[in-house]
Amino acid sequence: MERKDLTKLQAFALEEMLEGKNVFLTGGAGTGKSEVIKMFIADREKAGKNILITAPTGTAADILGGETIHRAFGAPVGVIANSKPVKKREEVLQATDIIVIDEISMCRFDLFEFIAKMIEFENGERARERMQEEIGIHLEEPAKPEIQMIVLGDFYQLPPVLTKEDKATLEEIYHYDFGEGFAFRSVYWDMFDFEPINLTEIVRQDNAAFKKVLSYIRLAKEKEMCTSFLQSHSSTFPFSTEDAIFLSGLNNKVSELNEKKLSELPGKTKTFHADQDGDIKMSEKFAEDVLHLKEGCKVMFTINALSGEFKNGTMGTVMRMQDNCILIRTADGNIVELHRYKKEITKPTVKETVKNIKEMDAEGNIQVKKRL
């Protein structure tokens, strides 16, 4: 996508971010949030800015080529207490110009506060350095402006994980109403003075009536009209579910159905195991550790191929399998020879001689990246 292809709201969001404003970019699925942020990142990187790209999970971080929030900021897993003050600057943040957090709805408020306190301390040190410059004190390096914060996601879609046990513990620690645990419930949310920009035009779907219904469903509005619309598009004739796609909001239900369908296919099951080294957290994994396949089973790719042979969401059928190679026929008839995909889980570090964010290999994770 090029700038000329952006909608008015998308173009406005891009310009506001390029002007250096802190932005909360939101909108329903298919409104182009990721496309806009990719343009912004490309532009700022070309301008020599250091961008720390993060997301709550490995899968979300992988989309923008970033790392998980926990790894980027060294955040602990689980409930985070709010009592520990920040006493020193983090080297990575000293080199950072812009922080991008994708899927902000999945970032729980206590994790957001952990991040915000680190940024607040860093920005305070930068303000002190700018003041020193103004009164003529020589600094080894020019003082920097505050870190620009860009957060994007949809609070109507994916909530943060908040178990009963965690909620009970958090209520003892945080003495304010954090509701469902969303990041905007944090007392630090307003510190960034985000400009909220809501993308409203669905660009991934051309059917105007369907787009309208999708928007209503997202906002839980016009329930009777939406129900009537969906029912009018359901079949009144007997039909086979043999090749139908089943949707579920629960991973265990999906796994049960996949196992059932796989067992119904003839032939032997071939099992692929992920090869991994180092300390990799569960939230940083972007695919299952074990994958069971048979010839004839249907799969869906969950990454984009650099070659363009397939993209996230491409459907296909397994034709043949070897230990390190799988032959897949995509839905449009193309044959893809799939080999093991290597994903390096990295953490940001800074070299003393060059104040640039560098990526240091932390752990390797080699997986066959597709899903039944």
What role is predicted for each listed range?
Residues M1-L372:
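Conserved ATP-binding/catalytic motifs of P-loop helicase motor domains
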